[in-house]
């Protein structure tokens, strides 16, 4: 029975064709004309770029200082090994944002993901994945691998500048592909409901790396899309109040003790004798007032002026509401 001309059809049939544990086709129909591409493109973009997952982000290989090198007894160069590590499919227990796993292998033959040692919080989904090949019985390789939780794709170059100071020599960064979705495509076919033949049928064909089932991936992508669209349901001007940073009443340097100025013992003792304990106390004094201080001569005065000037301060400054409550309570 036909509904109102202004009423939108909602999909009534969802068919899931499970081709393998990592490959599935999901069919959604009927959709109003044009909605197949609207929803298909939105879901495709989210599945490719916004799905959370786990990936290798760093690796330390024994005897290797940088990625542009080779290791004796290993067929692949280091860059190729890093590329192979990107293909490692890892599932990490919820609540863990990063874990470390290790690999120690010796003897001729392939080194695979199944050779990796890990605890119960980690699962290697593709244990047959080849990492490298050892070329002799005396060859060996040892590495420590960092796996992190993230979203989308984060190239190593994006983390070089932020981690350069803390990263020791020999710790190699890896381009991180966090998304568990390997391939995603959609097509729109014709659908029919009673006498209407201008409707859409959306078919989503996708493959994952095994850490997430295709059906669950689509469900999560749809949830992300729905949450983002919620903001458009009610377009009243509801603004999230910006948190205003409270500016300190006084420059922090004024709250520091005069000992931080590292004056000579003579000058420091003279100031303490006059109950000048903080830099804020000092800058409010004039040259004339300081020269009246017992045992503080012109040499000490010059020293004080120079030290204050080096910090952008001077004598004779006026500070409203000094001292602050935190100092007054002391």
Curated annotation (Swiss-Prot):
One of its GO terms (biological process) is DNA-templated transcription. Residues 250-330 are annotated as: Alpha C-terminal domain (alpha-CTD). The keyword Transcription applies. The keyword Methyltransferase does not apply. Residues 1-236 are annotated as: Alpha N-terminal domain (alpha-NTD). GO terms for cellular component: cytoplasm; DNA-directed RNA polymerase complex. It comes from the Bacteria. One of its GO terms (molecular function) is DNA-directed RNA polymerase activity. Keywords: DNA-directed RNA polymerase, Nucleotidyltransferase, Transcription, Transferase. Homodimer. The RNAP catalytic core consists of 2 alpha, 1 beta, 1 beta' and 1 omega subunit. When a sigma factor is associated with the core the holoenzyme is formed, which can initiate transcription. The N-terminal domain is essential for RNAP assembly and basal transcription, whereas the C-terminal domain is involved in interaction with transcriptional regulators and with upstream promoter elements. Belongs to the RNA polymerase alpha chain family. This is DNA-directed RNA polymerase subunit alpha. It comes from Vibrio cholerae serotype O1 (strain ATCC 39315 / El Tor Inaba N16961). The gene is rpoA.
């Amino acid at each position: 029975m036909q509904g109102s001309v202004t009423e939108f059809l909602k999909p009534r049939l969802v068919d899931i064709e499970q081709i393998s544990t990592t490959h599935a086709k999901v069919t959604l129909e009927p959709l109003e004309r044009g909605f197949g591409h609207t929803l298909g493109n939105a879901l495709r973009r989210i599945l490719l770029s916004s799905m959370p997952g786990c990936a290798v982000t760093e690796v330390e290989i024994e005897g290797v200082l940088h990625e542009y090198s080779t290791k004796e007894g290993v067929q692949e160069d280091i860059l190729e090994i890093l590329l192979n590590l990107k293909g490692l499919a890892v599932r990490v227990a919820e609540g863990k944002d990063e874990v470390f796993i290790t690999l120690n292998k010796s003897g001729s033959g392939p080194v695979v993901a199944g050779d990796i040692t890990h605890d119960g919080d980690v699962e290697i989904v593709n244990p047959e994945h080849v990492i490298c090949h050892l070329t002799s019985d005396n060859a060996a390789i040892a590495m420590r691998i960092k796996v992190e939780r993230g979203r989308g794709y984060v190239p190593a170059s994006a983390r070089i500048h932020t981690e350069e100071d803390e990263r020791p020599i020999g710790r190699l960064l890896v381009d991180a592909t966090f998304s568990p979705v390997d391939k995603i495509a959609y097509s729109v076919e014709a659908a029919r409901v009673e006498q209407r033949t201008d409707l859409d049928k959306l078919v989503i064909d996708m493959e994952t790396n095994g850490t997430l089932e295709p059906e669950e991936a689509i469900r999560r992508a749809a949830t992300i899309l729905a949450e983002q669209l919620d903001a458009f349901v009610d377009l009243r001007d509801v603004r999230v109040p910006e948190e205003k940073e409270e500016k300190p009443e006084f420059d922090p340097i004024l709250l520091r003790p005069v000992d931080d100025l590292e004056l000579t013992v003579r000058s420091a003792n003279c100031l303490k004798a006059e109950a000048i304990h903080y830099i804020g106390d000092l800058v409010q004094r004039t040259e004339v007032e300081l020269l009246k201080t017992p045992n503080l001569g012109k040499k000490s005065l010059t020293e004080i002026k120079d030290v204050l000037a080096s910090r952008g301060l001077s004598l004779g400054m006026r500070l409203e509401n000094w001292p602050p409550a935190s100092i007054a309570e002391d």
